[in-house]
């Protein structure tokens, strides 16, 4: 028994003195950007060679970044293009195919619904230019708001990102960014009790517009039914401040209806502005379904009429959205009603749904239909008509024309003119002949 125990201890001692080689394990990390098999288990003699052949995590990330940089840009993705050579050689679409509306199924499984995709003629580039960044910086520094951002205007890349300082512009929105009304087409914030008016806003607005050095600018405002005067005196003060800082500037104001108070309308019309704009938005039959219940079609007509009566030489302007379900007969009636109150300028644009909480688009109107209504409006005697899918009431499409009309009425740069005493129709004919309208 004792001999057996001694033999066992001898075997244990001999086994413990034997050195067992330790295996070196190479650790492998997995990244979502690459796929590679796990490396084999190697010993210390060849571990250095395997580390040289396997890419490091930093090398993998660098390779992935290189692939992204070599591919299409984000703007190519949004516009439907591509960065490869094959996509650049696509055959142009014919008009019938380009204007064809495409549908898509959206929603969770089992509850998908078909929607009409945004037509190609309504897609605009992503804004990113020096002028865009400069204007945005000025607005933030002066605590100003714009309808371009609040109403999600599709033309912001064009207006803010003009090719030069004089070409870039923004539409200032006065009296804050919160409206007391809730129209079903508008994405501006709404509240029954919006914040109080900023007493520095008139001065800050004048400072911003004087910095930009523009010849023609547009100011608009939210509706403020919580104020006794609807904010009319605030608008008047802003107009006067702007004219003091930049006497030569041409100023357009897109105003509300001031709850039908025509005295306030006359006060704004005689404040020194050059163009008085107030939008009827749609035909009379659709107004109760499109606009806030406090805004009526007939009240808007009275506002436009009162502005013209307060200053007969003042240019009056309004805007109509298409694609809400209006009929051709209703549009004819609307244009006749506007001419009856001597409205000078009318614009037509496509209604585009800002969010799912707003009323749906009834129809995407083709560009040639907008051209047709432009011809009809001019034949009815309107001074100017800007009509197109992306045209908005404060969009700069008509500003060059209106600016020239105003300058000729002032007698500035009129070639063989009559000191600005010509009729509106003669203004139109002379400017068209001079190549202002193309």
From Swiss-Prot:
Start and end residues of each stretch annotated as Disordered: 34-58
Names of the cofactor(s): [4Fe-4S] cluster
SUPFAM superfamilies found in the cross-reference section: Radical SAM enzymes
InterPro entries in UniProt: Aldolase_TIM, Elp3/MiaA/NifB-like_rSAM, LIAS_N, Lipoyl_synth, rSAM
Catalytic class of the enzyme: transferase
Biased composition (Low complexity): 34-57
A GO term, aspect molecular function: lipoate synthase activity
Transit peptide: 1-31
GO cellular component: mitochondrion
Binding site for [4Fe-4S] cluster 1: 148, 153, 159, 394
Protein localization: Mitochondrion
Pathway info: Protein modification; protein lipoylation via endogenous pathway; protein N(6)-(lipoyl)lysine from octanoyl-[acyl-carrier-protein]: step 2/2
Catalytic activity, as annotated: [[Fe-S] cluster scaffold protein carrying a second [4Fe-4S](2+) cluster] + N(6)-octanoyl-L-lysyl-[protein] + 2 oxidized [2Fe-2S]-[ferredoxin] + 2 S-adenosyl-L-methionine + 4 H(+) = [[Fe-S] cluster scaffold protein] + N(6)-[(R)-dihydrolipoyl]-L-lysyl-[protein] + 4 Fe(3+) + 2 hydrogen sulfide + 2 5'-deoxyadenosine + 2 L-methionine + 2 reduced [2Fe-2S]-[ferredoxin]
Keyword line: 4Fe-4S, Iron, Iron-sulfur, Metal-binding, Mitochondrion, S-adenosyl-L-methionine, Transferase, Transit peptide
Cofactor: binding details: Binds 2 [4Fe-4S] clusters per subunit. One cluster is coordinated with 3 cysteines and an exchangeable S-adenosyl-L-methionine.
Residues at which [4Fe-4S] cluster 2 binds: 179, 183, 186
Boundaries of every Radical SAM core domain copy: 162-383
Record-listed E.C. numbers: 2.8.1.8
Family classification: Belongs to the radical SAM superfamily. Lipoyl synthase family.
UniProt-recorded name of the protein: Lipoyl synthase, mitochondrial
């Amino acid at each position: 028994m004792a001999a057996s125990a001694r033999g066992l201890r001898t075997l244990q001692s001999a086994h413990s003195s034997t050195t067992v080689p330790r295996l070196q394990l190479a650790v492998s990390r997995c990244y979502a950007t690459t796929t590679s098999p796990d490396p084999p288990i190697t010993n210390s003699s060849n571990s250095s060679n395997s580390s040289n052949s396997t890419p490091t995590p930093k090398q993998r990330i660098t390779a992935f970044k290189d692939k992204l940089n070599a591919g299409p840009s984000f703007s190519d993705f949004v516009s439907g293009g591509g960065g490869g050579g094959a996509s650049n050689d696509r055959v142009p679409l014919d008009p019938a195919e380009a204007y064809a509306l495409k549908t898509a199924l959206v929603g969770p499984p089992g509850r998908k619904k078909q929607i009409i995709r945004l037509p190609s003629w309504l897609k605009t580039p992503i804004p990113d230019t020096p002028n865009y960044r400069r204007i945005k910086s000025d607005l933030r520094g002066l605590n100003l708001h714009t309808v371009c951002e609040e109403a999600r205007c599709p033309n912001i890349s064009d207006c803010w990102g003009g090719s030069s300082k004089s070409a870039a512009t923004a539409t200032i929105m006065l009296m804050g960014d919160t409206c007391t009304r809730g129209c079903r087409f508008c994405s501006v914030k709404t509240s029954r009790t919006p914040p109080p008016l900023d007493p520095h806003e008139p001065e800050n607005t004048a400072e911003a517009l004087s910095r930009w050095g523009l010849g023609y600018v547009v100011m608009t405002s939210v509706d403020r039914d919580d104020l006794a005067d609807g904010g009319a005196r605030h608008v008047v003060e802003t107009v006067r401040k702007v004219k003091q800082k930049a006497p030569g500037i041409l100023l357009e104001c897109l105003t509300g209806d001031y709850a039908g108070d025509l005295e306030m309308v006359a006060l704004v019309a005689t404040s020194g502005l050059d163009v008085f704009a107030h939008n009827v938005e749609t035909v009379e039959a659709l107004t109760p379904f499109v606009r806030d219940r406090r805004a009526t079609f007939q009240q808007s007509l009275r506002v436009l009429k009162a502005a013209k009566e307060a200053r007969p030489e003042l240019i009056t302007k309004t805007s109509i959205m298409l694609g809400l379900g209006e009929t051709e007969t209703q549009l004819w009636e609307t244009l006749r009603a506007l001419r009856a109150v001597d409205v000078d300028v009318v614009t037509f644009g496509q209604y585009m749904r800002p969010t799912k909480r707003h009323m749906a688009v009834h129809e995407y109107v083709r560009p040639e239909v907008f051209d047709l209504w432009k011809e009809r409006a001019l034949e009815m005697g309107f001074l100017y008509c800007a009509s197109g899918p992306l045209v908005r009431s404060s969009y700069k499409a008509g500003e060059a024309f209106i600016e020239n009309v105003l300058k000729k009425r002032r007698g500035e740069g009129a070639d063989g003119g009559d000191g600005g005493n010509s009729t509106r129709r003669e203004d139109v004919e002379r400017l068209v002949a001079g190549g202002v309208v193309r």
